[in-house]
Amino acid sequence: ESVALEYSRYNYNAKNLYQADQFRASDHDPVIIGISASGTTGGTATLNLLNFNDFHGRIGKNLTVPFAATIEQLRAEHPDSSLLLAAGDSIGASLFNSSAQKDQPTIDVLNALGLKASAVGNHEFDQGYDDLTGRVIGTDGKRNAQWDYLGANVYKKGTGTPALQEYSIQNVNGVRVGVIGVVTQETSTLVSPGGIKGIEFGNPVEAVNRVARQLTDGDESNGEADVIVAEYHEGAASNEDDATAKPTIDEQKAASPVFKKIVDDTDPAVD
C-alpha cells in the first residue's frame, strides 16, 4: 500500500503503488462499464476512479509531494475520464503544519488537486457541525472546500431531514457518476457532543440504499446516475498485531458486523 496512492496514516514507508487486495481504497484501474453514453446504445465508457481516505492533514514535504504527484500521474494516464474522490477524515487529527491553521492548508491542497466529492468522516466533526458547514465547506458564494462534502446519513435531530448534501453527480467522459457519502453511525461517540447537538447519525447502509434508489428511479428531477459509487467512512476489523495478515472478505465479515452489512446489504445498484 503506497502512502501516496492508497493513503493510510498507519503506513508510512510502503513501496508498492498498487496491491490488489481487499484493503485497497479502490482498484485504481480504469473501469470499463457497459452503458448508453452520449446518446449511443450498447456503448462503453472508461472511468478512472481515484480514491483516498484518512488523509488527516498530512501536510509535509515528504508526504504531500508524493501524494499529489501520484494523483497527477494517474490522472494524466486518463485525462478525460478521471475522477478524484475521498471517503472522509481528510481533516482532523492532523499534523501540526495543518492543525495549527485549522486544516486550511489541507483544504487548499485538496482544492488544488481537484477533489470532486468526499464523504464526511467522523473527524470532519471534531470542531463541530457549525464549523464544518460554515468554515470548512463555506456558504453559497463563499465556498472554502471546492468539493462536495457528503453525508447522506447525517440528519437534523429528530427528523429525516438531511443536514448535509447527500450525493453528488459528476459528469465524466459522458457518464453521470453518482457519488453517495456516509459516515460511521458511531460518530456521536467519537466527537464532542456539544458540537453535534443539533444533528444525528443514521444507518449508513440504509441511507446509501435510499439515495441509490432515488438516483435510479427514472425521475430526472431528483437526480439520475449511470454509475453509482458509495463512499463509506467505515472500517473493517484489523489485526494490529500482524500487519502482514490478509484476511479474506468472509473473515472480515465474520469479524465485523458493520462491514458484513455493508458488503451484504448495499443495494446492487451501487457499482
Predicted regions and their residues:
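Short beta-strand scaffold segments in enzyme catalytic cores
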Residues: 31-33, 168
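Acidic, metal/ion-coordinating pockets
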Residues: 7-9, 16-25, 39-271
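Short, conserved phosphate/pyrophosphate- and ester-handling motifs at nucleotide-, phospho-/glycolipid
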Residues: 28
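Intrinsic disorder/low-complexity detector
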Residues: 13-15, 31
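Conserved beta strand-loop-helix elements of the APE1-like EEP
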Residues: 1, 35-38
